[in-house]
């Protein structure tokens, strides 16, 4: 049976893609046929191949099972803004059925599929649909990425509570160091360990620029996912 997970974050720009690439690397090292899925991405650049999003490209590079870009990222928008705004501006509605069909296609080929969200847990995809709604429909186990910075404890607790209220399993969380560790770093991590009701899969240290291109799988331990 295919293992499937959804990666969400405490906010936008907290390292979801860095963590997702690390997860794909670690799962590949365990022998899985892996693929990353970024169903909706805003903030893309025009290339000779069309609009391309850097996060989706990173997932494509770190998947062990080669896939065309369109399979990794069915909805690509140019402006780096909330997907429901970008889709309205471009006159291209986001259809939840398209997201689900894309996921089914990948699940039929890989045995470890990781879906990365956009922004935070409740990011709107339309006036009536959030990413959380779709994840709940798909019943995906959730992995939370916490960007370790001031305010992250509150954001982590709120997100974990929202996942719980959606009736979904929070199967793990990842600490992503967004800057060199400060004086209170250890206390932040200790508090996060205490208040997040899920196992810590690992801490990705501050790596500077282009962390999604680094060998980050080494920082994770997926054994809690294997036991779940």
UniProtKB/Swiss-Prot annotation:
Pathway: Cofactor biosynthesis; biotin biosynthesis; biotin from 7,8-diaminononanoate: step 1/2. It is found in: Cytoplasm. The active site is at 38. Keywords: ATP-binding, Biotin biosynthesis, Cytoplasm, Ligase, Magnesium, Metal-binding, Nucleotide-binding. It comes from the Bacteria. The keyword Chloroplast does not apply. Substrate binds at residue 42. Its cofactor is Mg(2+). It holds the Pfam family AAA_26. InterPro entries: DTB_synth_BioD, P-loop_NTPase. GO terms for cellular component: cytosol. It is an enzyme of class 6 (ligase). Its EC number is 6.3.3.3. Mg(2+) binds at residues 17, 55, 116. ATP binds at residues 13-18, 55, 116-119, 176-177, 205-207. GO terms for molecular function: ATP binding; dethiobiotin synthase activity; magnesium ion binding. GO terms for biological process: biotin biosynthetic process. It catalyses: (7R,8S)-7,8-diammoniononanoate + CO2 + ATP = (4R,5S)-dethiobiotin + ADP + phosphate + 3 H(+). Belongs to the dethiobiotin synthetase family. Catalyzes a mechanistically unusual reaction, the ATP-dependent insertion of CO2 between the N7 and N8 nitrogen atoms of 7,8-diaminopelargonic acid (DAPA, also called 7,8-diammoniononanoate) to form a ureido ring. Homodimer. This is ATP-dependent dethiobiotin synthetase BioD 1. The lineage of its organism: Bacteria, Pseudomonadati, Pseudomonadota, Gammaproteobacteria, Enterobacterales. The gene is bioD1.
